Every structure is written in C-alpha cells, then in structure tokens.
Amino acid sequence: MIGKITSEMISRRWALSLLGAFGFVAAPTVPRPSNAEAQTAGAAPGRRKVALALQGGGSYGAFTWGVLDRLLDDATIDIVGVTGTSAGAMNGAVLVDGLVRGGPEQARAALRRYWEGVGAMPGFGSFFSNMSGEEAARTSLESIPAYVEAVKKNLSPYDLPASNDNPMRRLLTEIDFERLRLQDEIQLTVCATNARTARRRVFTNHDLSVDALLASACLPQLFRAVEIDGEPYWDGALTGNPAVAPLLTKMPGCDLIIVRVDPVNRPEAPRSVRDIYNRSVEISHNATFWLELGALAVVLRFVDEGRSPFGRVRFHVMEASSVMERFPMSSKLNNYPPLLEYLFNLGRQTGDAWIAQNGDALGRRSTMDLQQLLPGSIWNNI
C-alpha cells in the first residue's frame, strides 16, 4: 500500500535533492534534543563552540578579518569549523592554520600578516595616497585613468602571457598544509567551481592546498583557471558563497555564524557598463548562497520530528550592510592599506557590538530567522 504523499514530504525530498547538487551527502538523521540539550548543544562548560561561514568579496574580506580578530579575542568562544569561499577561503585557511599552530593569538598575528601582505601587493595605492581608508572605500576605481584603460581593453586572461607568478601564492606559502591535513580538531571546507562542468568542488582539511585556495578565489575575468587533478577551476562564489551544507553535515546542531560582506541591497541601480557587470556578478554570487540556505530551511523544519540530518542548527549573522552597500562595487578590487585597515576596524566593531548584544544566545537559540535572512522571493518559493 502506498502511503499518503504530503506537500511536506515533497518539500523535504526537493530540499535534500537540491542540497545533493550542492555536494551534501545525507547523514543519519539527528534525534530531537531535549530542551536542556538544545540549550547546551556543542558547548563545553564555560565555552561556546561556533562554526563560521565566510563569504568572498575581494578586499571586503578585510571586514571579515576584523570580525575574526574580535572572535579570537573572546576567551569563551571556540572556533571548531569554518567554511569559506574566495577571500573567505583565504581568511579561513589562515585562521585555522594559526589556531592549530598556537591558538588564538597566533591566528590573530597570522591574519594580520596576511592582510598586510595583501596591502603590499601592486595596486592603485598612489592614487589614494592622500585619502583616509573610509574616503578610499567610497571612491570608485573608475575615477582612475589606468583602471578605466584596463577595463576598456577587455582582454581575456588567455590573451596575456601565461604566468604562474600569482602574488597570492607567495602569501599562502606560510600556511602549513600538511599540518592542516593531519588535524581534525577544526573542520575546514573551501569550494571552487569547475569551469568545464559547472559543478562545485568542496575541498576539506584532507585535500586542501595552495592551488585549492587560488582556485576558490580565481576571478575568471582576471586569472586563468587553476588546474587541479586535470580539471580547470574558477571562483567558488559562482556555486557557493560559501558552501554551507558540507560543513553542517559534519557538525549537526551547531551555532553557525555567517559573516556577510556582499551587500544584498544597493541604494541605486547601476548605470555604467562596469557597475552593471559588477552588480550582476554580486547578485549571482549571492543567489547560490540564498538557494542553499532555502533548501536548508526546508530540511530544518523537520527537526522537531527528529528527521533533520543537521540537527537543531542555530543561525547568526554578522554584517555591516548599511555601511558597505554605499561603497562603489569596484572598491572590492582596491588593496590600499588604509582602506583594508578601515574595513578591519569596521569588522571588529561589528563583531564587538554583536557579541555584546547576542553573545549569550550562542549554544541556546538563533539570533537570525532564515526567513528574515533570505530575500522574500526565495522564501516564498520553498
């Protein structure tokens, strides 16, 4: 006899199928926790364990650096899992490497060295030399003749001489990848997009490498695809910004802090050719993330019935969208050191305010409803 198929069953099957496309492999369902367990799940006495989801966004990753610095400064918070894409992947790998090497202070120092290295790379710094970091953040690169000329040429990376001398590679050689592969204390996932098949590949502690990080941050309009195992890879944000489900599979019932740097809203519709292109990329990078969270939201509706493979995940978001949505989109490509320091301070202040207001919720409840996080059109269709 065929049992009754309800809309809830269809929704759950749809969501799990969609998550499968994102690289999620179904784990045994997690029983419904008691109220006491729900309040203390994943938290040792006196400690609050969190997982982090770090978005990509070029120089905006310095905002995430500031958030991480504040979290590392809190002796009651343990970071036990990280998923990141592009700049978020770089932040995540440097963070976890530092934690494994010597704890929070080592991680803070490693992140500062990394971002100081980013600021020391060639860029448009001479144009901004008389500006504060905030002024630079509000200034479009389109006001720089050299940038405009480069954009006008509209060259493919394959039109230029081949070079393996990516300056980011030198910064990443400080990471001890062998140590990362051997440790299981902190789960780390990074995603990249296969340029040939359009499928997402998720790298974990055990197969992470410099090439995997460069692939995750490989903007196809700027760099040639990074080849790994004979396949070409582009920016992971095309298929997951970041990839959430693979991490939650390993950490059911966790507190997940999403550090969001890509603005959802912009005060005005773009008009220039470059701004139109940049905004379309920004929207597409957010879309896969929203869709994945939407599928998670459907599955998590079944947690009270003991049928969610993720347990009772508690969601939190740290962002400064009201400030960052007013920055020109080209500022993501600006590595001017005072701008990076400004974003760092903005991130640290954001983290400090969030902890003061919401820190007590860790291990107990969500501070962000997915319905509020997702755009209405996404939520209404799940």
Regions found by a protein language model. Give the residues of each.
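Catalytic nucleophile loop
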Residues: 89
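Catalytic nucleophile serine of serine hydrolases
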Residues: 86
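Patatin-like phospholipase
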Residues: 2-83, 93-382
